[in-house]
Amino acid sequence: MYAVAGRLAGIDTNLRAFESYSPARKRWTKLARVPGARGGTGAAFAKGLIISVGGEKPQGTIGSVFGYNLATKRWRRLADLPTPRHGVGVATIAGRVYVIGGGIEPGLSVSSANESLNP
């Protein structure tokens, strides 16, 4: 299990944390930090990558998408979301990542955007 970014309290306390959990050891392990602090990011797994999608920061919503390669233990930038947003639903079907809904402005907002990417 992986935890990607997040926040401690309000939107101005976003994190770059990236951690994995081992149920056998009952322990979290810190991994390479996410490129850029973000709260409300979505995440999925596809093609050997843990993918961090969008998010928000005090200045607005985030459209950037990053993939963490489990083999190389490095982040790389992928194609940005056409519609930057936070709080998205993310799912992988047949290697394609689907990004559903979310908010287009920081705080409580909604979007009907549905987009997909092929990492």
Where are each of the predicted segments found?
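Kelch-like beta-propeller repeat domains
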Residues: 1-119
